[in-house]
Amino acid sequence: MSDLGAVVALLLWGQLFAVDSGNDVTDIADDGCPKPPMIANGYVEHLVRYQCKNYYRLRTEGDGVYTLNNEKQWTNKAVGDKLPECEAVCGKPKNPADAVQRILGGHLDAKGSFPWQAKMVSRHNLTTGATLINEQWLLTTAKNLFLNHSENATAKDIAPTLTLYVGKKQLVEIEKVVLYPNYSQIDIGLIKLKQKVPVNERVMPICLPSKDYAEVGRVGYVSGWGRNANFNFTDHLKYVMLPVADQYDCIKHYEGSTVPEKKTPKSPVGEQPILNEHTFCAGMSKYQEDTCYGDAGSAFAVHDLEKDTWYAAGILSFDKSCGVAEYGVYVKATSIQDWVQKTIAEN
């Protein structure tokens, strides 16, 4: 059984639930757990109930309760001898973000409000963001992955050049990088870790939504390790609160404007913001606070009050605004949901 689960002991209505002994269930008739007394017109059943540690939940079609049968096998009425699994909880930070001021310099995340936020360092020590979506996979942008790589670079070329941190500067090893097939139109890539990361209050994935949360006016939170108001990379995770903007206004804002292209190496994704049906904009041009260089790859996190769960409505793709009256551009999570699930299942 996984060390994320445990077996608990309960004596309830004459039914004995087996003793908790870590990952091993003791013989119920040994000296550590004596046989219960018999009752008239009744009998004793030996039952175990599987439970998960904090920040994990039981995944099973049954109820997690197993009975010892005559063949001395633990079975569940619904799933037989198939054991349940403990899967990581997503989108349930212990200390969720408060409704605070929007600041480019950022509000310090001292409480672990964004446990899905990862820090990625690419070639030549450039800091960018990534977003944990389960225990072993993260989303980031194709632009981030191609930083300081030539347009001919492959995913295999890129993976060894990246350094990734989760939680409080916890270094994790990267197994592979997977680029979205049409990354010139949908600026997204996936990162697979060599090992699953233990989930706790500092490290927790954000949930991917089944519906589109990128509605005009909806407020989301974006955390990151990008440049601050002095254009220096920060050593502390910061966050900003931004509203989803009208797409027409955003497109109109960027019409005719360009971002200087780097001469070498040239990225196959390009430097300009990608605006299409798979993206949305956030930020309002009358404000002078926003995301900045190095924040790309971070989630536009929204709080569903009914479910009390945080979802990634999008992933920040274009982060060049830096408080100069421009919009940030995000890839919609709903546009990549099927690809993400398929890629994870195949790898």
Swiss-Prot record:
Belongs to the peptidase S1 family. CDD domains: CCP, Tryp_SPc. It comes from the Eukaryota. PANTHER family: COMPLEMENT COMPONENT 1, S SUBCOMPONENT-RELATED, HAPTOGLOBIN-RELATED PROTEIN. Disulfide bonds join C52-C86, C90-C207, C250-C281, C292-C322. SUPFAM superfamilies: Complement control module/SCR domain, Trypsin-like serine proteases. GO terms for cellular component: blood microparticle. Residues 1-18 form the signal peptide. GO terms for biological process: acute-phase response; defense response to bacterium; immune system process. It is found in: Secreted. PROSITE patterns: SUSHI, TRYPSIN_DOM. The keyword Disulfide bond applies. As a result of hemolysis, hemoglobin is found to accumulate in the kidney and is secreted in the urine. Haptoglobin captures, and combines with free plasma hemoglobin to allow hepatic recycling of heme iron and to prevent kidney damage. Haptoglobin also acts as an antioxidant, has antibacterial activity and plays a role in modulating many aspects of the acute phase response. Hemoglobin/haptoglobin complexes are rapidly cleared by the macrophage CD163 scavenger receptor expressed on the surface of liver Kupfer cells through an endocytic lysosomal degradation pathway. GO terms for molecular function: antioxidant activity; hemoglobin binding. Expressed by the liver and secreted in plasma. Tetramer of two alpha and two beta chains; disulfide-linked. The hemoglobin/haptoglobin complex is composed of a haptoglobin dimer bound to two hemoglobin alpha-beta dimers. Interacts with CD163. Interacts with ERGIC3. Residues 259-264 are annotated as: Interaction with CD163. Keywords: Acute phase, Antibiotic, Antimicrobial, Antioxidant, Disulfide bond, Glycoprotein, Hemoglobin-binding, Immunity, Secreted, Serine protease homolog, Signal, Sushi. Glycans are attached at N125, N148, N152, N182, N232. InterPro entries: Haptoglobin, Peptidase_S1_PA, Peptidase_S1_PA_chymotrypsin, Peptidase_S1A, Sushi/SCR/CCP_sf, Sushi_SCR_CCP_dom, Trypsin_dom. Residues 31-88 form the Sushi domain. This is Haptoglobin. The beta chain mediates most of the interactions with both subunits of hemoglobin, while the alpha chain forms the homodimeric interface. Residues 103-347 are annotated as: Serine protease. It holds the Pfam family Trypsin.
